[in-house]
Curated annotation (Swiss-Prot):
One GO term (biological process): defense response to bacterium
Regions crossing the membrane: none
Alphabetical list of SMART domains matching this protein: WAP (SM00217)
Family: Belongs to the venom waprin family.
GO cellular component terms, A-Z: extracellular region
Pfam families per UniProt: WAP
Record's keyword terms, sorted: Antibiotic, Antimicrobial, Disulfide bond, Secreted, Signal
Keyword match Ribonucleoprotein: no
Protein name: Waprin-Rha1
Location(s), subcellular: Secreted
GO MF annotations in UniProt: peptidase inhibitor activity
Signal peptide: 1-24
Length: 76
């Protein structure tokens, strides 16, 4: 019984670790702008995306100055 619980927990942990790898594979080119500045860029204080695939054209899903995720142009 304990072995089953252990294997189930191990499987859940491994699946959780694979989530970031899958989302990174569908990412768009470029990198998110740096929001760790003395005066962070303004942003909509609402999450509008979860992954790059939620954003139009070349935009990426990045943290904004308000701490939420939103579509933005990648930094150059």
């Amino acid at each position: 019984m304990q072995a089953r619980v252990f294997l189930l927990l191990l499987g859940v942990i491994l699946l959780g670790m694979m989530g970031p790898m899958v989302s990174a594979q569908d990412g768009k080119a470029g990198s998110c702008p740096d929001v760790n500045q003395p005066i962070p860029p303004l942003g909509v204080c609402k999450t509008t995306c979860a992954t790059d695939s939620n954003c139009p054209d070349i935009q990426k899903c990045c943290k904004n100055g308000c701490g939420h995720m939103s579509c933005t142009r990648p930094s150059t």
